[in-house]
């Protein structure tokens, strides 16, 4: 997520997607950055504007059983469901005048929501940059690939954490690597057939112990498939047992280091969290969480589906108290201790394959 708003990446996105910018959005962007800066200086949360980047969860259902994912491994305790199109549109109507980017995933497989392409199209028509992440199992026909392209989706991540079925299924439990390969091929061909530049296709490879030797071959597969980017990402774990099983032996591909206190995220402790100023997480039922690391919405800020409510939520007591707490001592929040946001390190690396 962070690389999208990094200083090196942002100018490229501004040039490519000039359509998403307006004076109102630019003013909001500047307001957010200024309030963030002031907050860091005075050590007290000041909030101007609203988040310029939104994360929206279309569904928290998933077809796979990935062992490190709360949705797949069954550890997620919150109710499951799909975001309704009506609630979604009302939320977009309220927030799109000032926000310019929508990351359309969280827990679950977005394309299990049958309205997903229509959701993307609605956001696109509102001038939002749209981005999603998928396990690639629902691009089964040429018509489905064309629907994705025609929706106006700007960018898509397709997860492919292996080069053969034996390796792939060790993490993507219940998945079929050939379906993913075929789906990516269909999407590349659909773009060519329709003469479309988007969506840009990212092939994502999460590095784990069982696949760490396949990175170069996976990149070659990405080139052969004709995708736009190859994304290498480190794995997030939640227990020592998971660490022993999944973290790569090659230290440069791990986001953690071992200490006397156990596993900790590499790098110097980070003060505060900028995400709490520029982004917000809206789950399928409208529950607003501070970010995507709050898997079970333990820190519910309010409901985005109550008409005109988001402005009050964004500056409400719950959000402000949480910002104050994180600004004072980020390590005091459990989920923040396992978060790489703001740290300098190789947590993800994007290689451009096509200009």
Provide a role label for each language-model segment.
Residues 52, 275-276, 332:
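Short, basic and Ser/Thr-rich N-terminal targeting/leader segments
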